[in-house]
């Protein structure tokens, strides 16, 4: 009876002791992140680094409308196809839009030499000045400038020709040698285009140019080429058996371009002084331009985001996130989200000893739960929480700043003869893309691992801070909790939390209570030992008596014979 009373006394004393627990925040978040060692770790807070949403529209870029070519393409716009006349007045744009129906290009059949390279050049041009490089009325007095029209380039039901070129033919059965130069005084690159006509027969050659053995020479400091017309019978295209070859070059500021010819020259009338801009580009999409504004445009739609990565489209124009193949890039900022009713699973408790977080602590990441005669409650440790928030915020901002080098990525142009180069280029681009995706994913995995370890370390440091103050004035009872050997009111609890706990003040009370509890435990242990001895002896006597009774019964009925020899 005495033992039972002592045990009850010990239990009663333990139940009414004041306690202080170290813990961490938990909430109802379902955000998951990946680390180097784990996948789909639920965390209290995280930030998404990957943009996967767009508006599905073509928008203005930085408030500037794009140049929508409609049924025209780049060639038609630059040569001045009569069907593209409405586009001639547009001098600036944010980017260029072609459609799958942009068929109005070279109306007179022929080849546009290095057309893909010209498109690539224009992908970095945001505006140009269209100016008359060789005035029509004064530049060619000895040649006919109005007869060079064709049914292949109709306008308003009549034969016409490109608005930016002049098809020179003979005048009064004479085509004297021409020589004309232009000096670039625009202070910027000037794009100049011209053409060479290839008649189908010698008769056509003489009818148009009089000279049977004509030539064309075009030269500048960087471009020098002599052309000879290729007279040959060809199948008709757009009603024409002849062909034209279209050429272009860029004239640097201060440079001179010279045209010399005895026939077959389609001379430039207008040229283009170009202003380059890194945010321009060419998009092929059938959508119209909407009344919206964006900083980043893709062929799938506009992106308005400050995130460093996107997985929408590799071709972008404007201030755009980097394209990666990833489907998820989420960076942890908070702790592992493990409410106390759940198990931590394979990797155990946070900080190695606390089994669950507190949903009741909402004003910080780390903190305390106390219980004493005045009540109980949660309180966040503001200093450690704020230090952690500042550190993680700076880290996230640094990662985003380093990775958020916004740029324009345009598709590269290749013609059908350069298919092998195009395929090789795609392989190289895919290789770089794979490497960039791997680097981005690895960065996030490593930073998530460091963040979660950082939180674990902060909780453990907070626990050690409390333990170093309390020393033997309290005992560790597991799961991050301390049980005081003395009464600890709210003022006492607050002193522990803010690091001003007065250990000597409570040492004597703690010593007495500790010795009393230890004495109760010792007395209880001795009584249990005596009871165990008595129980063992009694059990042995009962066993011996039982064996004797069985033996006597068996001897009496003959089942067991006993012989005593002397």
Curated annotation (Swiss-Prot):
Residues annotated as signal peptide: 1-17
Membrane-spanning segments: 530-550
Residue intervals annotated with topology Cytoplasmic: 551-566
Glycan-bearing residues: 27-28, 40, 104, 304, 498
Site features described as Cleavage, chain residue numbers: 344-345
Disulphide connectivity of cysteines: 21-481, 59-292, 72-84, 107-153, 296-320, 488-492
InterPro entries xref list: Capsid_hemagglutn, Hemagglutn_HA1_a/b_dom_sf, Hemagglutn_influenz_A, Hemagglutn_influenz_A/B
Entry keyword Glycoprotein: yes
Keywords: Clathrin- and caveolin-independent endocytosis of virus by host, Clathrin-mediated endocytosis of virus by host, Disulfide bond, Fusion of virus membrane with host endosomal membrane, Fusion of virus membrane with host membrane, Glycoprotein, Hemagglutinin, Host cell membrane, Host membrane, Host-virus interaction, Lipoprotein, Membrane, Palmitate, Signal, Transmembrane, Transmembrane helix, Viral attachment to host cell, Viral envelope protein, Viral penetration into host cytoplasm, Virion, Virus endocytosis by host, Virus entry into host cell
A GO MF term: host cell surface receptor binding
Subcellular location(s) per record: Virion membrane; Host apical cell membrane
Main location: virion
Annotated Gene Ontology cellular component terms: host cell plasma membrane; membrane; viral envelope; virion membrane
Miscellaneous comment as given in the Swiss-Prot or TrEMBL entry: Major glycoprotein, comprises over 80% of the envelope proteins present in virus particle.
Quaternary structure (record): Homotrimer of disulfide-linked HA1-HA2. Interacts with human CACNA1C.
Name of protein: Hemagglutinin
